[in-house]
Amino acid sequence: MKSYYFESNEPVSVQQLNNINVLYYPMPMPDYQEKLDQICQERGYKNRDEVKLNENTENLDAKLKIFFEEHLHDDEEIRFILEGSGFFDVRDANDQWIRIRVEKGDLIIVPANMYHRFTLTETKQIHACRLFTDAPKWVPINRHQQ
């Protein structure tokens, strides 16, 4: 994981992310299951699914356009990266973008009600495990709708 201010490229530490309630867990690969199960138990994540995006994904550009629209959710957004890489952009307390590059072995938790967006890296490939407290769902509330 690497994070930095989008405009200035100034590095952002894990502690700075924690200060805005974005949580990061480095996961041991390939033996991640025990740690993942522990995090799920501690945080009440009862459901999970997997999503794969790559150049062969039907309507990839349309999906990425939706993901890159600035939005928030009523629930946390939890992603554990199994393969590939992507960028989460989150807003800090001063409404500045922080870019977070996630890749294989990274688990990130974006808190509920935090504006963010997502896109793939230049490789255009990611395989992620999505974790949920209830039934799997992804309902964005776009910023322009507020």
From Swiss-Prot:
Instruction: Indicate which residues the UniProt annotation says bind Ni(2+).
Output: H71, H73, E77, H116
**Which SUPFAM superfamilies did the record assign?**
RmlC-like cupins (SSF51182)
- Judged by the first EC level, this protein's enzyme class is oxidoreductase
The yes or no answer to whether the keyword Oxidoreductase is present is: yes
User: What Enzyme Commission number does this protein have?
Assistant: 1.13.11.54, 1.13.11.53
Residues binding Fe(2+) = H71, H73, E77, H116
Keyword vocabulary terms for this entry: Amino-acid biosynthesis, Cytoplasm, Dioxygenase, Iron, Metal-binding, Methionine biosynthesis, Nickel, Nucleus, Oxidoreductase
Free-text comment on the cofactor = Binds either 1 Fe or Ni cation per monomer. Iron-binding promotes an acireductone dioxygenase reaction producing 2-keto-4-methylthiobutyrate, while nickel-binding promotes an acireductone dioxygenase reaction producing 3-(methylsulfanyl)propanoate.
One matching Pfam family:
ARD
Cofactors named for this entry: Fe(2+); Ni(2+)
Q: Where in the cell is it found?
A: Cytoplasm; Nucleus
A GO cellular component term found in this entry reads: nucleus
Q: Which reaction does it catalyse?
A: 1,2-dihydroxy-5-(methylsulfanyl)pent-1-en-3-one + O2 = 4-methylsulfanyl-2-oxobutanoate + formate + 2 H(+); 1,2-dihydroxy-5-(methylsulfanyl)pent-1-en-3-one + O2 = 3-(methylsulfanyl)propanoate + CO + formate + 2 H(+)
Keyword Oxidoreductase: yes or no?
Answer: yes
InterPro entries named among the record's database cross-references:
ARD, ARD_euk, RmlC-like_jellyroll, RmlC_Cupin_sf
Q: In which pathway does it act?
A: Amino-acid biosynthesis; L-methionine biosynthesis via salvage pathway; L-methionine from S-methyl-5-thio-alpha-D-ribose 1-phosphate: step 5/6
Q: List, in alphabetical order, the GO biological process terms annotated in this UniProt record.
A: L-methionine salvage from methylthioadenosine
MF terms per GO, please? acireductone dioxygenase (Ni2+-requiring) activity; acireductone dioxygenase [iron(II)-requiring] activity; iron ion binding; nickel cation binding
Q: Which family does it belong to?
A: Belongs to the acireductone dioxygenase (ARD) family.
Its function? Catalyzes 2 different reactions between oxygen and the acireductone 1,2-dihydroxy-3-keto-5-methylthiopentene (DHK-MTPene) depending upon the metal bound in the active site. Fe-containing acireductone dioxygenase (Fe-ARD) produces formate and 2-keto-4-methylthiobutyrate (KMTB), the alpha-ketoacid precursor of methionine in the methionine recycle pathway. Ni-containing acireductone dioxygenase (Ni-ARD) produces methylthiopropionate, carbon monoxide and formate, and does not lie on the methionine recycle pathway.
The identity of this protein, by name, is: Acireductone dioxygenase
The source organism is Heterostelium pallidum (strain ATCC 26659 / Pp 5 / PN500)
